[in-house]
């Protein structure tokens, strides 16, 4: 008997999700924003990991003074910085939207500040790499 009641409750809850009508455009936009922020967080993790790896390569560059390593690090820094500058413009534009609630606005503003910090860190590392005198 308890099992039948439990099944009825589960079925009622699952069906009630289909009965409640939500504006489909708003639902899509929130789903898009959620997916966008998940992708953004994943890419920022990758860039932060890449920045850590480039910092380690910079330490190696200080020891070896290799011209090839210096050029490789500068290329990777340039690519990451350009990617972040494009993402910064997009996130600033999204943060200006008027349909955002307080939580969504906070997410976009946090994304903007995160990107600005990473761009600054990449630029500082690029200055350090350029300052290293290579042997060649």
UniProtKB/Swiss-Prot annotation:
Effect of residue 67 to A: Decreaced IgE-binding by some of the 24 patients tested
Consequence the record notes for mutating residue 120 to A: Decreaced IgE-binding by some of the 24 patients tested
Impact upon substituting residue 133 to A: Decreaced IgE-binding by some of the 24 patients tested
Outcome reported for the amino acid change (mutating residue 34 to A): Decreaced IgE-binding by some of the 24 patients tested
Effect of residue 25 to A: Decreaced IgE-binding by some of the 24 patients tested
Phenotypic consequence of residue 26 to A: Decreaced IgE-binding by some of the 24 patients tested
Tissue-wise expression: Highly expressed in foregut (stomach), midgut and hindgut. Not expressed in body wall, reproductive system or body cavity.
Result for mutant: residue 49 to A: Decreaced IgE-binding by some of the 24 patients tested
Consequence of substituting residue 71 to A: Decreaced IgE-binding by some of the 24 patients tested
Impact upon substituting residue 96 to A: Decreaced IgE-binding by some of the 24 patients tested
GO MF entries: protein homodimerization activity
Consequence the record notes for mutating residue 65 to A: Decreased IgE-binding by more than half of the 24 patients tested. Identified as a major epitope
Record annotation: effect of changing residue 116 to A: Decreaced IgE-binding by some of the 24 patients tested
Record keywords, A-Z: Allergen, Coiled coil, Signal
Self-association and partners: Monomer. Homodimer.
Family: Belongs to the mite group 5 allergen family.
Protein name (Swiss-Prot/TrEMBL): Mite allergen Der f 21.0101
Species assigned in the record: Dermatophagoides farinae (American house dust mite)
